[in-house]
Amino acid sequence: MDINDTKFIIDRLAHNTGVFREIFTGISPEYASWRPAEGKWSFLEVVNHIRDEEELDFRERVKAALENREAPAIHPGKWVTEKNYAGRDYISSVANFLLEREHSIEWLRSLKDIDWNSKWTNPQFEMTAYGFLVNWLAHDYLHIRQLNRMNFLYLKEKAGDVSLQYAGDW
């Protein structure tokens, strides 16, 4: 891929809005709070994580790279407890994420004559705006995979003694 592929990346981010919407739809409060194991995140925590990443990480860092400026420090791994993701309302959390994604797509599609090679630098590393954009999409895929795995594990738990081996290897 090269910087001419930004439309493809942005279109995939827009497409993933629908993927996330469908994954998050129809989840009961019990299901939304269920964790696949001790120390693992629930659906509620994942949706709040990707909501904050949407606004405070990826969108902000693409902007910072395009403007050749620093971006505020972030600590996404700590946010789950610091921001009490588990204590939030699931339906509102999903709506907030989808709204932030809509803002991101509108903003990304409004960009014209952009130097996607513009860099964001901090003491740990540097990355181009294009690099952040591609990683944004990769981050979507990481969490789509995570949520699909959580769906499978939830089904496995609820299925009890029924073997899921016929479905294929996980």
Where is each model-derived feature located?
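Amphipathic, non-membrane alpha-helical segments in soluble helical-bundle scaffolds
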Residues: 3-13, 40, 87-94, 130-133
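Acidic/histidine-rich alpha-helical segments that form the ligand environment
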Residues: 78-117, 131-136, 146
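Short acidic/polar alpha-helix capping motifs at helix-coil junctions
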Residues: 9-12, 24-26, 68-69, 81-82, ...
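Solvent-exposed alpha-helix faces
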Residues: 18, 25, 51-52, 102, ...
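Alpha-helical packing segments of well-folded alpha/beta enzyme cores
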Residues: 9-12, 16, 20, 58, ...
